[in-house]
Curated annotation (Swiss-Prot):
GO terms, molecular function: GTP binding; magnesium ion binding; uracil phosphoribosyltransferase activity
Activity regulation summary: Allosterically activated by GTP.
Binding-site list for 5-phospho-alpha-D-ribose 1-diphosphate: R81, R106, D133, P134, M135, L136, A137, T138, G139, N140, S141, D202
Catalyzed chemical reaction(s): UMP + diphosphate = 5-phospho-alpha-D-ribose 1-diphosphate + uracil
Similarity comment text for this entry: Belongs to the UPRTase family.
Organism superkingdom: Bacteria
Cofactor note: Binds 1 Mg(2+) ion per subunit. The magnesium is bound as Mg-PRPP.
Name of the featured protein: Uracil phosphoribosyltransferase
Broadest EC class assigned to this enzyme: transferase
């Protein structure tokens, strides 16, 4: 399903793996493996508009002009800590991508993001920049991360997540209407604690085995 600003990847493999990730009986090892696998599938959609060029190669039969990615034009930015799980799968496909990290945590009282770390690649103005975080809940952390990246020069941005809430999508649309969102599912709502419902719990805790 594709709407303005939002693409929900409803491929059967994506939805099957997401169901396994939602199941509370899935182990930490299983959750981690599924996150890597689903990130490989989501990478296909979020990188759809990567810039291409052509090079001349020799096949076993003849010379030809063949399409290839244009240089090192991709930057991946993980919102720590759970974003790392989504990033790993994309790096398997595009190992030359530049990588950055933004550390944000959500204040449990205000639900507002608090930044504690930032290290991003140079020349973001020349790269497609994909921000990865499994959950787009309130949208506050995502908006803060994109604010930081735009201040650092990023202009061609995408946001990739596993689950999104209607509230988070609307928050992103209001703050950054130029940033497309790619997700595996648009869930029903947020609860009173700012968690996505039905959701899958805390993605970071389930990936790292912490509480």
């Amino acid at each position: 399903m594709t709407q303005a600003h939002l693409t929900v990847v409803d491929h059967p493999l994506v939805q099957h793996k997401l169901t396994l990730m939602r199941d509370k009986t899935t182990s930490t090892a299983g959750f981690r493996r599924l996150l890597r696998e689903i990130s490989l599938l989501l990478a296909y959609e979020v990188t759809r508009e990567l810039e291409m060029t052509t090079i001349r190669i020799d096949t076993p039969l003849c010379e030809m002009e063949a399409p290839t990615l244009e240089g090192k034009k991709l930057a991946l930015i993980s919102i720590l800590r759970a974003g790392n799980g989504l990033m790993d799968g994309i790096l398997e496909l595009i190992p030359a991508a530049r990588v950055g990290f933004i550390g944000l945590y959500r204040d449990p009282e205000t639900l507002q993001p608090v930044q504690y770390y930032s290290k991003v690649p140079k020349e973001l103005d020349a790269r497609m920049t994909i921000v990865v975080d499994p959950m787009l809940a309130t949208g506050n952390s995502s908006v803060a991360a994109i604010d930081l990246l735009k201040a650092a020069g990023a202009r061609n941005l995408r946001f990739l997540c596993l689950l999104a809430s209607p509230e988070g999508v609307e928050r992103m649309r209001e703050a950054h209407p130029d940033v497309p969102i790619v997700t595996a599912a648009l869930d029903e709502r947020l609860d009173e604690h700012g968690y996505i419902v039905p959701g899958l719990g805390d993605a970071g805790d389930r990936m790292f085995g912490t509480k």
